[in-house]
């Protein structure tokens, strides 16, 4: 999480933002680690992050609200989001919890693979061409199918107390969140490309 957060801040600096890297990077590490101790600490870390960034903003007149926002977003986007998979792993003890975490990742991987295969072969209707020109609705539904297949397999194992419809819903949600993450990343990447071309 700290490497991802650092890279995000590097890109934002190319765009003229000045994040507080120390506070943001520390928060990005503490978010997933705090879950291992007690999920309540997530709230504490959130509070401290807002408090420290508020003090930074008040103390330094040159600090812009955009710098504060970028610092907070970087820590949340990387560390806080990563803590979700840690929470999932800790929710179920033993190897079943580890297997479920791997299953979530596998559903994302298969979703991406099916989206690429279906989209590259049948993709004609673009989702958001201005942000991600190669993403199509055909690929999106192919990705949904791939993710749902993994979750049906998870249900079929009988290791978890979930029914078929809930497993299908999980597959759909994971796939949609994966697409959202891809689009968000695609929205961020042009910042670095633009500045690299300029140099």
Report residues per predicted region.
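Transmembrane alpha-helical segments of integral membrane proteins
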Residues: 180-193
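Membrane-embedded alpha-helical bundles of polytopic integral membrane proteins
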Residues: 1-136, 140-172
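Conserved small/polar residues in nucleotide/adenosyl-binding loops
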Residues: 194-199
């Amino acid at each position: 999480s700290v490497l991802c957060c650092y890279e995000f801040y590097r890109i934002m600096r190319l765009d003229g933002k000045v994040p507080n890297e120390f506070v943001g990077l520390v928060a990005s590490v503490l978010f997933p680690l705090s879950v291992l101790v007690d999920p309540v600490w997530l709230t504490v870390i959130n509070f401290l992050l807002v408090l420290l960034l508020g003090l930074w903003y008040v103390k330094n007149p040159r600090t812009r609200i955009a710098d504060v926002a970028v610092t907070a977003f970087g820590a949340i986007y990387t560390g806080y989001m990563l803590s979700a998979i840690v929470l999932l792993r800790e929710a179920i003890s033993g190897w079943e919890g580890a297997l479920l975490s791997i299953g979530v990742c596998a559903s994302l991987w298969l979703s991406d693979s099916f989206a690429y295969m279906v989209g590259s072969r049948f993709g004609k209707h673009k989702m958001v061409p201005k942000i991600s020109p190669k993403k199509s609705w055909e690929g999106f539904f192919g990705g949904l199918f791939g993710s749902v297949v993994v979750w049906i397999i998870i249900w079929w194992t009988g290791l978890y107390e979930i029914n078929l419809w809930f497993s299908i819903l999980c597959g759909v949600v994971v796939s949609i969140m994966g697409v959202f993450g891809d689009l968000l990343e695609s929205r961020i990447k042009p910042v670095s490309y633009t500045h690299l071309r300029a140099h």
